[in-house]
């Protein structure tokens, strides 16, 4: 079984338990355990050398009982159907947790944009939209940025969809440049959401952010913004990593210096001679550990070595079920991904609302509304976990899936 098969299976297992605790029967689980629609497309792209290369793309729409589906599009060589399926299920949970009128969606293309020219990436982006255009739209399924996609790619996709639709459709996609209807604060919303989760977790442990020792795995979009936010709040960032290694300084790394040298793909460690391994990064003495890279990073093999008292999941699925159990038994407060990383989809929702009404908010208004939603969600999930004596992941799944299940029941789907 591949890692992505494991992600789907473990997610299904927790959803099943959550539905059982909510009193829903097997029929509801049968409906929710798989996406309602799973699209695979082939995208021919003329490369700069004149040859034509055909790429495989996916779009999953997990459940639209509540409303249109919502979720990012990632460009990565490891994208496959199972990963996209699992990610769409998590998006349903995130939307339920922060009370958004969406179901979960997700998309991806099997490619390595680091090995492509900007013109090739543009042609691929437009080709993907042409391939999925009948299945998406501002009231059907709304894409957004994800791994190795950004506001420029969203702009190309919006332009292509608008040409096909013969109507300017800014609400078709979120994460756009401000000038094309993007929202203030969207580019750093995922990281700010993680900061809010860290603040709430620290509050429960009577911990001050100022002076706290933090380790962040991943220095991409979310990881780098997160490092900067925490650095400015006075936290001591003692370890960061990227795809090539990790850096450690017990006295705290100079985050501004690293950000100045980071490339567009979040790489910085290759500029340094002295690095540590990913394994050593997770063993560092710290107060807060934030996995902000890829899935299955905290496992039963290294969960006993973690020294942090708080783990906040900024990445999707970084902790296996076995590791979750170990961390919980050790008394470590684990804030799950579906709560901690919900900032991105929340501000995407704000962008969609602003597009629909043609009235735009300041960054201060966006951040205030984001904080209000995420603090309320954290309070609800933490209180449920304490009252029922369950871990925060199961509590988050109970809150996250309840709305979709109730909407499906009222519609007569299960």
Swiss-Prot record:
Top enzyme class: oxidoreductase
Subunit architecture: Homohexamer.
Catalysed reaction, written as an equation: L-glutamate + NAD(+) + H2O = 2-oxoglutarate + NH4(+) + NADH + H(+)
Annotated organism of origin: Staphylococcus aureus (strain COL)
Coiled-coil parts of chain: none
Protein name per UniProt: NAD-specific glutamate dehydrogenase
Family: Belongs to the Glu/Leu/Phe/Val dehydrogenases family.
SUPFAM superfamilies registered for this protein in UniProt: Aminoacid dehydrogenase-like, N-terminal domain, NAD(P)-binding Rossmann-fold domains
InterPro entries given in the database record: Aminoacid_DH-like_N_sf, Glu/Leu/Phe/Val/Trp_DH, Glu/Leu/Phe/Val/Trp_DH_C, Glu/Leu/Phe/Val/Trp_DH_dimer, Glu/Leu/Phe/Val_DH_AS, Glu_DH, NAD(P)-bd_dom_sf, NAD_bind_Glu_DH
Positions of the record's site feature: Important for catalysis: 146
Binding site for NAD(+): 190, 221
Keywords noted in UniProt: NAD, Oxidoreductase
Residues the record lists as binding substrate: 70, 94, 348
The enzyme's E.C. designation: 1.4.1.2
Keyword NAD: yes
Annotated active site: 106 (proton donor)
Keyword Hydrolase: no
Gene Ontology terms for molecular function: glutamate dehydrogenase (NAD+) activity
A matching Pfam family: ELFV_dehydrog_N
Gene Ontology biological process terms in this record: amino acid metabolic process; glutamate catabolic process
